Amino acid sequence: MSNVSFRQDHDFEKRKAEALRIREKYSDRVPVIVEKSEKSDIPNIDKKKYLVPADLTVGQFVYVIRKRIQLSAEKAIFIFVDNVLPPTGAMMSTIYDENKEEDGFLYVTYSGENTFGSSMT
């Protein structure tokens, strides 16, 4: 899998048009880009783009990521939005509304260690 980020691989206008199309077609879902932290030695994820149900919690989404990278139960995984650990009980729709980028995607970074250390309140 390429280490090129989604932003580098797709220009802004294409990303924005795609996110808009997704939101119009699937109003009950949010477009999320998931990328591994550069510093982490955790496994790579098999795909970066996800269409996440709006009512999914952050904790449930972490479970999805854990399954996609086939991470064993004893290994830790953390996800970050703008270098901040979101609350596990928060709805993905809320995190999306508060943190989506100008292109319409929510960017999530995952790591095997708590590299940033702070959490959203």
Curated annotation (Swiss-Prot):
Post-translational modifications: The C-terminal 4 residues are removed by ATG4 to expose Gly-117 at the C-terminus. This Gly-117 forms then a thioester bond with the 'Cys-558' of ATG7 (E1-like activating enzyme) before being transferred to the 'Cys-258' of ATG3 (the specific E2 conjugating enzyme), in order to be finally amidated with phosphatidylethanolamine. This lipid modification anchors ATG8 to autophagosomes.
Coiled-coil region(s): none
GO terms (BP aspect): autophagy; protein transport
Site features described as Cleavage, chain residue numbers: G117, S118
Recorded topology in the membrane: Lipid-anchor
GO CC terms: autophagosome; autophagosome membrane; cytoplasmic vesicle; microtubule
Tissues where the protein occurs: Constitutively expressed.
Lipidation (Phosphatidylethanolamine amidated glycine): G117
Subcellular localization, as worded in the UniProt entry: Cytoplasmic vesicle, Autophagosome membrane; Vacuole membrane; Cytoplasm, Cytoskeleton
Residues that make up the propeptide removed upon maturation: 118-121
Family, as annotated: Belongs to the ATG8 family.
Name of the protein: Autophagy-related protein 8g
Organism: Arabidopsis thaliana
Gene: ATG8G
